[in-house]
From Swiss-Prot:
It catalyses: UDP-N-acetyl-alpha-D-muramoyl-L-alanyl-gamma-D-glutamyl-meso-2,6-diaminopimeloyl-D-alanyl-D-alanine + di-trans,octa-cis-undecaprenyl phosphate = di-trans,octa-cis-undecaprenyl diphospho-N-acetyl-alpha-D-muramoyl-L-alanyl-D-glutamyl-meso-2,6-diaminopimeloyl-D-alanyl-D-alanine + UMP. It comes from the Bacteria. This is Phospho-N-acetylmuramoyl-pentapeptide-transferase. Its cofactor is Mg(2+). The gene is mraY. It comes from Shewanella denitrificans (strain OS217 / ATCC BAA-1090 / DSM 15013).
Length: 360
């Protein structure tokens, strides 16, 4: 909203023209979301404690998790609020991409909120029935996929960028809708599965969002896009503000979520953030790159698939417990060691993903 005010004030003082620069607004967006999260965090935690909205811990999980029982959850509300405030202040609300991101964050956040509410407030350990959760996720993702396909005006908006191959960018046609759907829903559930240890999910999310901020900026700049042989997407520049808002809100949340956590994000945070990363990947045409940079999320998801598949087919488990971060806990690794090592892996994969922009 302040973009429009600054545009109006430019006629009185040219200094306000600085607000037209995406990079300047991106920095302000990051700082706004960060300060908002740090300021509102203690208030939200106290409120959640008063309402007795505490984490439900599985009885068959690692014994070290029993001490987490009752820790305030649904802290993802803090992240989403920080992102929304930041984007509404510094983003261009006429941008199709910004509106899509607000819809994704809001819709998947609502699904996660319903799930958390049933688990924590109504004491239903199953939460939202898996079938209904998947149906609601699918509807939201399909709305986004169909809208983006039907409103696309440039060939690059429906091409697939293949890392390491600069001349391989097939036009997807209707396959775009299928790929966008699976990317958004898959990323949403992958981050949700990763959110099992203090700070484990939020830091990789911050890293990937930061990398996508750079990619969105490059995609929105015609000279950089042509140099790197990626689609030039004029609207992608505004995604930088969304990405930096996620980074700022995520870092602010990590202040309270780092080991030992004072609050957990809950499904309201993990489902929304995962879907947001998936949607950003779709918008900048980097779905495959998300698989690389979000490798920790992929690893967690694959471990669950392998565990369930092996048990059903052979009656044997591959890991001591899935997702895989619990496997290492049961092997005797202290929780902070698991978390930091997964962070290091995530940083490596994000840097590898960024390197593919040039290694083509």
């Amino acid at each position: 909203m302040l973009v429009y005010l600054a545009e109006y004030l430019t006629q009185f003082h040219t200094g306000f023209h600085v607000f037209s620069y995406v990079t300047f607004r991106a920095i302000l967006g990051l700082l706004t979301a960060l300060v908002f999260s740090l300021w509102c965090g203690p208030k939200l935690i106290r409120r959640l404690q008063l309402l007795q909205i505490g984490q439900v811990v599985r009885n068959d999980g690692p014994e070290s998790h029993f001490s987490k029982r009752g820790t305030p959850t649904m802290g993802g509300l803090l992240i989403l609020a920080g992102i929304f405030v930041s984007v509404l202040l510094w983003g261009d609300l006429e941008s199709r991409y910004v509106l899509v991101m607000l819809f994704v964050l809001g819709s998947f956040g609502t699904i996660g909120f319903i799930d958390d509410y049933r688990k924590v407030v109504r004491k239903d350990t199953k939460g939202l029935i898996a079938r209904w959760k998947y149906i609601l996720q699918s509807l939201a993702a399909l709305v986004v996929a169909v809208f983006l396909y039907s409103s696309s005006t440039l060939p690059g908006e429906t091409q697939l960028v293949v890392p390491f191959f600069k001349d391989v960018m097939p036009q997807l046609g209707l396959v775009f809708i299928v790929l966008a759907y699976f990317t958004i829903v898959g990323a949403s559930n992958a981050v949700n599965l990763t959110d099992g240890l203090d700070g484990l999910a939020i830091m990789p999310t911050v890293m990937v969002a930061g990398a996508f901020a750079l990619i969105a900026y490059l995609s929105g700049h015609v000279q950089f896009a042509n140099y790197l042989h990626i689609p030039h997407l004029p609207e992608a520049g505004e995604l930088v503000i969304v990405c930096t808002a996620i980074v700022g809100a995520g870092l602010g949340f990590l202040w309270f979520n780092t080991y030992p956590a004072q609050v957990f994000m809950g499904d309201v945070g993990s489902l929304a953030l995962g879907a947001a990363l998936g949607a950003i990947a779709v918008l900048v045409r980097q779905e495959i790159l998300l698989v690389i940079m979000g490798g920790v999320f992929v690893m967690e998801t694959v471990s669950v698939i392998l565990q369930v598949g092996s048990y059903k087919l052979r009656g044997q488990r591959i890991f001591r417990m899935a997702p895989i971060h619990h496997h290492y806990e049961l092997k005797g690794w202290p929780e902070p060691r698991v978390i930091v090592r997964f962070w290091i892996i995530s940083l490596f994969l994000v840097l590898l993903g960024l390197a593919t922009l040039k290694l083509r």
